[in-house]
Curated annotation (Swiss-Prot):
Belongs to the G-protein coupled receptor 1 family. It comes from Homo sapiens. One of its GO terms (cellular component) is plasma membrane. This is P2Y purinoceptor 2. CDD domains: 7tmA_P2Y2. Residues 339-363 have a biased composition (Basic and acidic residues).
Amino acid sequence: MAADLGPWNDTINGTWDGDELGYRCRFNEDFKYVLLPVSYGVVCVPGLCLNAVALYIFLCRLKTWNASTTYMFHLAVSDALYAASLPLLVYYYARGDHWPFSTVLCKLVRFLFYTNLYCSILFLTCISVHRCLGVLRPLRSLRWGRARYARRVAGAVWVLVLACQAPVLYFVTTSARGGRVTCHDTSAPELFSRFVAYSSVMLGLLFAVPFAVILVCYVLMARRLLKPAYGTSGGLPRAKRKSVRTIAVVLAVFALCFLPFHVTRTLYYSFRSLDLSCHTLNAINMAYKVTRPLASANSCLDPVLYFLAGQRLVRFARDAKPPTGPSPATPARRRLGLRRSDRTDMQRIEDVLGSSEDSRRTESTPAGSENTKDIRL
């Protein structure tokens, strides 16, 4: 329950909102000191383990890289770094908003938290765009499906997010009060209006725009997959049903993890400057704190999603060792004098043409047939 205290007064009985510097309302946040340490701890351990396994597969088992695997690798790096930033926050909230470390480390932890959160969002966007091009324009996507282009895009994503999150190092600070040092995730009172403006820009640039792009991509893919093939009738083939379900799961996870967090955080920041009742502000504050673990859970769910979408990675993880023998077409390529990069491009073309042929077989197969092939997204 929140109570009016007057602007910039101290709090009573340890119920001061740890993210605020002398705000006019006093919030009862005892639930936060249980919810956040437990939820961050639950996310941290499996998040590190799952993404470590993913990175092992990418670095040690995967021999051929394309745009999709490149984006997934950087997504795994981002999620692993995000999970690695959680132990200090677990300790901080378990101690009741007491930060025994330096101000520099406080700034760094908050910076890593938001940097890797938004890197994950942008790499999910890159994967979605790549899949969309592969479904809608499979041949034209060959040029942009090369690993070297994906590496450039991934590098641009890291530079963009690091540049956008650099102001966090300026805004975030610590404050001592009643023998307790608080590591704020906002700013000092005199900078709060600027921080809200900055957060609004980041909301649009690093969440709203990527979310809209992902939504459009998956709607277009679903429309293409749900469109009946020429000369066929009956229900949707099993492969297409599976692909549509995968699309629905990706959208649901993205919306569940990121949308509530960003909506409640925007309301939390915006309404603090309005003359609202403390009861309303306390409800918004509680909603914001509850949605924080949802955003963190994405680092555990991402490995499951891209393993489901990339069945080739699952085979690499399952097999004792990756195939090393030459493909049947290798001697012919050697006779033609193709370089390694040319052979890679040839293989990519064959994969796409093979996928197109599989898609045509799928579309011509009656509903319920056991010969239906999976469509690669």
